Structure formats: C-alpha cells, structure tokens
Amino acid sequence: AKEIRKLKKDAQITMISADEQVHSRCMLHKYLSHERTAEELSFVEEDFFEKNQIAEVYGHIEVIDTANQMVDTKGGESICYDKLLISTGADSFIPPVGDLRKAKNVFGLRHLKDAQEIDKMAEDAEKILIIGSGLVGLDAAYGLIERGKKVTVVEMAEQILPVQLDAHAAKTYQELFEQAGVQFYLGCKAEGAVCEADGMIRAVTLDTGKQL
C-alpha cells in the first residue's frame, strides 16, 4: 500500500485486513516469550495510515463480485474497487487428525490473535506439544521455552527444518534446542487425538504408538 501510494498520488487506497493492528508475523514468538508487547510488534509509525492517506478496514471478505468490482465484508460493508490486490499470504495448517481441529487448546500461529490465545492458554500449561518443526514451529518452541514451559516437537521428516537446512545444520540447531530442554520426535506423525468432555485434548498418539 505504501509503494502504491508513491506511484499513485491521487488514488483512493483501502486496505482490508483480518488483523486489528499492523504487526510483524516474524516476531510473534517474541510476544509468546514476553520479550515484546503487541504494540512493540508493529513495524510502521502510529500515523502510517493517516500520513499515506490509506483507509484501513478491519474484517474478513466474504464475497468478491468481479462483475461489479465490489467486495462484501463479513460485517456487511460493501466496498467498490477499480483494481483489487489480494496479498493474504499463507495460513497456518492444523492437521485433520482426530479432534485437533475442534479442540479448545489447539492453535495455529499466524496472526497476533493466535499468539494472544496461545499466550493465555500457556499461563496454566506446563507441557506443550508442537506439531511441525518448520520455522514457525521452532519459533513457537523458542517463545515457550523462554517462559519455562516443557516443549515437545513432533516432525514427520527425519530432521528439523527439513525445507530450510541440510541434515548437518539441522542437527546443530536440534542440539541447541535440546540443550534448552526441548524434546524431539522425528520421523513420525500425529495419528490420534481425542477431546475430553471439556473440549480439551490432553494427549496425542503418534503413528509409532507413543502417546504424548
């Protein structure tokens, strides 16, 4: 939006976001570790929208009407456009395993609100299980071990950070996390998880038969 404003001085720019405030997704683990507040995750000035003459709309898009060049938000607002730029990026993925997707204490980590929910739940949690040892999973592990939590990571590949690192570098990172108390289960995946009566999952079964 900032670059478009530089190119189009007189254009009417509206930015619609599901996030209530601008924040760096790459720093969400710092929120989990309590090293930064929500406000300290922002990477723009307080007057960014006003200074760049950008209208900010909080909400979700439900309908994109390309014929009439209009979008409808979940809140019932209709916004017209000449050009529509969709830059939503990726999203967190919760595996369709057992009751993982409906449990009250299972979260992805993509938005600030996700980090806030994890932070709240972590207050009373001692043991935390993370499925996936990619960048986001290990960032979350860092944030939570900084809080003194006992963290276990499950990864279906034979090494951590399988997309980013070779086996030698991955082993080095793994050893550093293990020195901080993280336990890894590699080359296996979650196979079962059942919600208890209160909607919480307290154990996950791996395809090896191991229950965590």
Predicted feature locations:
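FAD-binding core/adjacent interface of flavoenzyme oxidoreductases
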Residues: 45-129, 187-188, 192, 203-211
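Beta1-alpha1 glycine-rich phosphate/pyrophosphate-binding loop at the start
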Residues: 1-55, 143-164, 168
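Surface-exposed, flexible loop/turn segments at secondary-structure boundaries
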Residues: 21, 92-93, 114, 136, ...
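A Rossmann-like FAD-binding core segment of flavoenzymes
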Residues: 10-12, 52, 56-72, 79, ...
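A general structural signal for well-ordered alpha-helical segments in protein cores
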Residues: 25, 29, 94, 115, ...
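Rossmann-like NAD(P)H-binding beta-loop-alpha module
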Residues: 117-165, 201
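Glycine/Thr-rich phosphate-binding loops of Rossmann-like dinucleotide-binding domains
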Residues: 23-24, 81, 94-95, 138-139, ...
